[in-house]
Design a protein with these regions (language model features):
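Conserved class I S-adenosyl-L-methionine
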Residues: 2-61
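Conserved SAM-binding loop of SAM-dependent methyltransferases across substrates and taxa
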Residues: 76-87
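Conserved SAM/SAH-binding beta-strand->alpha-helix loop
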Residues: 98-100
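Conserved SAM-binding loop
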Residues: 105-106
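Conserved SAM-binding strand-loop segment of SAM-dependent methyltransferases
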Residues: 111-123
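A short acidic, Gly/Pro-enriched loop at the edge of an enzyme's catalytic core
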Residues: 126-134
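A short glycine-rich, Lys/Arg-flanked "PGG" loop and its adjoining helix->strand segment in the class I
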Residues: 150-162
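Conserved beta-strand signature within the Rossmann-like core of class I S-adenosyl-L-methionine
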Residues: 163-170
């Protein structure tokens, strides 16, 4: 059962999704710029739970070379840095709505010429279907209503090149709702799903392949 703060959190973002996609994007950018007024607001670089989630995410990937990688909702680039170390030959793009977060991400990796950070909104961003691997972690619940989740699923699927892999990581059992349009998408097939139930918060790592 969700806690009261989680319920209020979800209600807030569901209300935001009553706006147009563009209007919702403006509010989300302002919200996350405010949230990043102090560095690493979620303690992603030091929290044991977050580090466990990163390791678990990588453990579920199909073993293959990945040349072009995108992380949607990269925040300050903590997981992006891990990806750059794990795949030293890959071109990596980190995407977030908060320019303040991206400034810190660029400062974290100032010499990583093959890593770039881009301010963009997954609901409106247009990119070539060129990525071998796309990550979307702890992001979809900010989008609110089902029509926005459906739109995000379409957008995520379009990022993948032939044979590309999409990894979605979200709280369990909320992931069932958040991933439903990915599960049903005509251009995606679910490859694996693993649920981690250790405290403080269960989560699911769901891996999809481009058809």
């Amino acid at each position: 059962m969700r806690s009261l703060p989680e319920l209020l959190h979800r209600t807030l973002f569901r209300t935001m999704s009553l706006l147009s996609p563009k209007g919702q994007g403006v509010i989300l950018r302002r919200y996350f710029d405010w949230w990043h007024r102090s560095p690493d607001p979620w303690k992603l670089s030091s929290d044991g739970y977050e580090q466990h989630k990163y390791r678990s995410t990588l453990e579920n990937l199909p073993a293959r070379p990945y040349v072009r990688i995108m992380e949607v909702g990269c925040s300050e680039g903590v997981f992006t840095e891990t990806l750059a170390k794990t795949y030293p030959e890959a071109e990596i793009t980190g995407v977030d709505v908060s320019e303040r977060a991206l400034e810190r991400a660029r400062s974290r990796m100032p010499d990583a010429g093959r890593v770039r950070f881009l301010r963009a909104d997954i609901l409106t961003h247009r990119a070539e279907p060129r990525y071998d691997l796309v990550f979307c972690s702890e992001t979809l619940y900010y989008l609110g209503r089902h029509d926005r989740l459906r739109r995000a699923s379409d957008q995520l699927s379009r990022l993948l090149g032939p044979g590309g892999v999409l990894v979605a990581v979200h709280p369990w059992p909320e992931a069932v709702r958040l991933h439903r349009f990915l599960d049903a998408h005509a251009s995606l097939s679910r490859l694996t799903e693993r649920v981690y139930t250790a405290p403080p918060r269960p989560f699911a790592v769901t891996v999809y392949g481009a058809r």
